[in-house]
């Protein structure tokens, strides 16, 4: 799970702001970079717009010199098996040339503090088994590997 950090423990390295529908193209590009694949743009656009209206879904963008260079999504959910709120980080991506500059750490610290303020007992996330750099990043950030995730295409 997580060893909680305070937001002020991570020095700001970029500007963070909430995402809006005007950011659809930038967020789409980041998600395609994360997946190394292009998604159906119209389905993405519609889903992103719907998520922006959901009070339990939070998107934060990282900007350098006014350009979007990273993003994180935080989904607040009440888990029955915890009898408490959990902050699930579903996406965290930083453009490859910007990695290693603490942008991911700043985004993660924001999500952790946002979840903490909303009353969550922890944050959790899943990452593809192939993303070894991401695994090392999350371990450095205080996360512990505690579960296995199984998927099945439908």
From Swiss-Prot:
Cofactor note: Requires a divalent metal ion for activity. In vitro, exhibits a preference for Ni(2+) followed by Mn(2+) and very poor activity with Mg(2+). However, it is unclear what the physiologically relevant metal ion is.
Quaternary assembly: Homodimer.
Protein name in UniProt: Aminoalkylphosphonate N-acetyltransferase
Coiled-coil stretches noted in the UniProt entry, renumbered to this chain: none
Function: Aminoalkylphosphonate N-acetyltransferase which is able to acetylate a range of aminoalkylphosphonic acids, including (S)-1-aminoethylphosphonate ((S)-1AEP) and 2-aminoethylphosphonate, using acetyl-CoA as acetyl donor. Its physiological role in S.typhimurium is unclear. However, by acetylating (S)-1AEP, PhnO would protect against the deleterious effects of (S)-1AEP, a structural analog of D-alanine that has antibacterial properties.
This enzyme's EC code(s): 2.3.1.280
Reaction(s) this enzyme catalyzes, per UniProt: aminomethylphosphonate + acetyl-CoA = 2-N-acetamidomethylphosphonate + CoA; (S)-1-aminoethylphosphonate + acetyl-CoA = [(1S)-1-acetamidoethyl]phosphonate + CoA
Single GO MF annotation: acyltransferase activity, transferring groups other than amino-acyl groups
InterPro entries recorded: Acyl_CoA_acyltransferase, Bact_Acetyltransf, GNAT_dom
Gene3D superfamilies, alphabetized: 3.40.630.30
Keywords, alphabetical: Acyltransferase, Transferase
Record flagged with keyword Metal-binding: no
EC category: transferase
Cofactor section: a divalent metal cation
Source superkingdom: Bacteria
Domain N-acetyltransferase: 14-154
Keyword Phosphoprotein: no
């Amino acid at each position: 799970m997580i060893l909680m950090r305070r937001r002020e423990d991570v020095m700001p390295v970029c500007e963070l702001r909430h995402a809006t529908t005007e950011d659809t193209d930038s967020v789409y590009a980041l998600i395609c970079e994360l997946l190394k694949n292009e998604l159906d743009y119209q389905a993405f656009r519609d889903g992103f717009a719907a998520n922006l209206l959901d009070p339990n879904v939070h998107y934060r963008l990282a900007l350098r010199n006014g350009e979007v260079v990273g993003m994180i999504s935080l989904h607040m959910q009440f888990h029955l098996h915890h009898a408490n709120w959990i902050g699930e980080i579903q996406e965290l991506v930083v453009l490859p040339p910007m990695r290693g500059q603490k942008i991911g750490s700043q985004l993660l610290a924001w999500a952790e503090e946002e979840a903490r303020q909303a009353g969550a007992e922890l944050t959790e996330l899943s990452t593809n088994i192939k993303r070894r750099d991401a695994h090392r990043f999350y371990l450095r950030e205080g996360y512990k590997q505690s579960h296995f995730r199984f998927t099945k295409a439908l």
